[in-house]
Amino acid sequence: MKKTKKPLGYIAGNLFNEAEVAQRLKEGALLRKWRPDVEWYNPIEAPINDKSTMPTASDIFWGDTNKILKSSYFIADMTNLDLGTAYEMGIAWTINFMHKFFKKTKNTKKKKKKEKNFPIKKIIGVLSDIRVPTAGKYEDMFVPYGINQYFLGGCLDDGKVVHKFAEVEKLLKKK
């Protein structure tokens, strides 16, 4: 009997201080609990990102990018704009864009192979900053929060944005 391979999920977000590392680890544990049928890749847990082994920029880029390309789920912390997270989101968005672009391809065999190698991603952005709900009530320079609209637009173009990580669970249950 052939063993079915689990789909891959990717967890994107800042990884540069103790609080961010703790948050990524918490997210990984929750995602594995909510969707045990998915193999969740969490860069902070990956050997390629172990700074004691002195990985090169290329090692990190390709180690993580290969996982993004193969993932079916892409969950990103958008709260503190991180260049790495934005770049990862761009890769995930581009794969989905290419699927749409080539949707009219007549060659179904090639199409199936592309989908298997680079699956369409369910993209979910988490924008959990506590200032977001009231940001529109302020004026001028007193607006307490802003997000890069290009980054937000890319996520909303092909995904969803939630304001609490707990809301991700409900979206993951939707097919």
Region locations from a protein language model:
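Conserved catalytic or regulatory cores that recognize and/or transform ribose-phosphate-containing ligands
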Residues: M1-K175
